[in-house]
Amino acid sequence: MLLSRYIDDDLRECGCDEAGRGCLAGPVYAAAVILPADFSHPLLNDSKQLSEKQRYTLRPVIESEAIGWGIGIVSPQEIDEINILRASFLAMHRAIEQLPFRPERLLIDGNRFDPFEQIPHHCIVGGDARYRSIAAASILAKTYRDDSMLRLNKDFPMYGWERNKGYPSPAHKSAIRRFGVSPHHRLTFRGVVDADRPTTE
């Protein structure tokens, strides 16, 4: 299915989406993307509907053809301080701040958002499967976050982040019980806060 713009006009329409909200470890990432009005690509869809190979194929296309794009990151420590919902909004704000110019309309994937500098915004549940700019943002947020978890995995291979990317898989939760938490775990998250102490050999 070919995705569309939210409104067919001349306003600079910016799609925003986050990745990593439900993870036990690692930062939350967000992306903000402004696409040309005539942008189209047959593979473009919600990142969750694409294979890893398709996401990484699309990323350079989005980056090269977008009018502007930005990435925002919020650390696990910040997430623990302000909660994951506010952290997701903050990541989107930081992504928008990275854009080369101010958008005129924000499209937010989801049902809530903290307004940014009085720019009109529209919250759309499932927007990443309906609108091009949100789908593009979902792909950038997902791939950049996956890259960050692969880097973190080099120092903490026991948690299997190269496979689970920080999500609460059975193997990840088992590793937390066995090895304890890392500096990259979200200490206020269920599944981390109730983990057992490390086993002693």
From Swiss-Prot:
Cofactor: Mn(2+); Mg(2+)
EC id: 3.1.26.4
Stored InterPro entries: RNase_HII, RNase_HII/HIII, RNase_HII/HIII_dom, RNaseH-like_sf, RNaseH_sf
GO-annotated biological processes: DNA replication, removal of RNA primer; mismatch repair
SUPFAM superfamilies: Ribonuclease H-like (SSF53098)
Catalytic activity line of the entry: Endonucleolytic cleavage to 5'-phosphomonoester
One Pfam short name: RNase_HII
Keywords recorded for this protein, A-Z: Cytoplasm, Endonuclease, Hydrolase, Manganese, Metal-binding, Nuclease
Domain RNase H type-2: 11-201
Cellular-component GO terms for this entry: cytoplasm; ribonuclease H2 complex
Record's subcellular location: Cytoplasm
PANTHER family: RIBONUCLEASE H2 SUBUNIT A (PTHR10954), RIBONUCLEASE HII (PTHR10954:SF18)
Family according to the record: Belongs to the RNase HII family.
Protein name per the record: Ribonuclease HII
